[in-house]
């Protein structure tokens, strides 16, 4: 089984904000794979489907970002999913707008959703796709920046990043994550 988690905040208020790029990419994957998110368990909505010989689960936590681990860990335990069968997709202030970076492990880098996952999983060793949202303009508070929607000039870059991330997930269904990293980084 392969589990793909997109991080974000629940509710209309946060739809299509920078911090919710993980949710947006899960939605894109669901559309590409014809895999509706029609189930709910452990503070998350998800969908599952067998693709070839692999069962794939797409998941969006219903907790707020900084509590993401509370939704993901029970789900992984219940379905007996290992850390190398997990990919987490999330926004990254330290990457330029629209740039993606795949990693097999790493620190939270100040991201509260990843901090929560590390705390609940007990390790930094899990696959991730970091999606660049850039940094706020001088003086703009980070919290306002990440919870805001994209500027018009950012939309094409973010759409491209979402598409590339979805393609990386599709590739991971057939290849080891390290191979996918080498292709998409």
From Swiss-Prot:
Its main location: cytoplasm. It comes from the Bacteria. Monomer. It is found in: Cytoplasm. Its EC number is 3.1.1.29. Hydrolyzes ribosome-free peptidyl-tRNAs (with 1 or more amino acids incorporated), which drop off the ribosome during protein synthesis, or as a result of ribosome stalling. GO terms for cellular component: cytoplasm. GO terms for biological process: protein quality control for misfolded or incompletely synthesized proteins; rescue of stalled ribosome. The gene is pth. Keywords: Cytoplasm, Hydrolase, RNA-binding, tRNA-binding. Belongs to the PTH family. The active site is at 19 (proton acceptor). TRNA binds at residues 14, 64, 66, 112. It comes from Shouchella clausii (strain KSM-K16) (Alkalihalobacillus clausii). PANTHER family: PEPTIDYL-TRNA HYDROLASE. InterPro entries: Pept_tRNA_hydro (IPR001328), Pept_tRNA_hydro_CS (IPR018171), Pept_tRNA_hydro_sf (IPR036416). This is Peptidyl-tRNA hydrolase. GO terms for molecular function: peptidyl-tRNA hydrolase activity; tRNA binding. Pfam families: Pept_tRNA_hydro. The record marks 91 as: Stabilizes the basic form of H active site to accept a proton. It is an enzyme of class 3 (hydrolase). It catalyses: an N-acyl-L-alpha-aminoacyl-tRNA + H2O = an N-acyl-L-amino acid + a tRNA + H(+). The record marks 9 as: Discriminates between blocked and unblocked aminoacyl-tRNA.
């Amino acid at each position: 089984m392969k589990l793909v988690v997109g991080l974000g905040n629940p509710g209309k208020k946060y739809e299509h904000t920078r911090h919710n790029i993980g949710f947006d990419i899960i939605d894109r994957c669901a559309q590409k794979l014809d895999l509706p998110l029609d189930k709910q368990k452990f503070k998350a909505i998800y969908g599952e489907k067998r693709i070839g010989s692999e069962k794939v689960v797409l998941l969006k936590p219903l907790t707020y970002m900084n509590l993401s681990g509370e939704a993901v860990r029970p789900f992984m335990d219940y379905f007996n999913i290992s850390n190398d069968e997990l990919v987490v997709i999330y926004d990254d202030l330290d990457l330029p707008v629209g740039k993606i970076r795949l990693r097999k492990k790493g620190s939270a880098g100040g991201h509260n959703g990843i901090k929560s996952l590390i705390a609940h999983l007990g390790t930094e060793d899990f696959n991730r796709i970091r999606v660049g949202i850039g940094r706020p303009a001088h003086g703009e508070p980070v919290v306002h920046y990440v919870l805001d929607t994209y500027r018009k000039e950012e939309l094409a870059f973010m759409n491209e990043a979402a598409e590339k991330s979805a393609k990386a997930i599709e590739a991971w269904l057939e290849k080891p994550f390290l191979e996918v990293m080498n292709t998409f980084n």
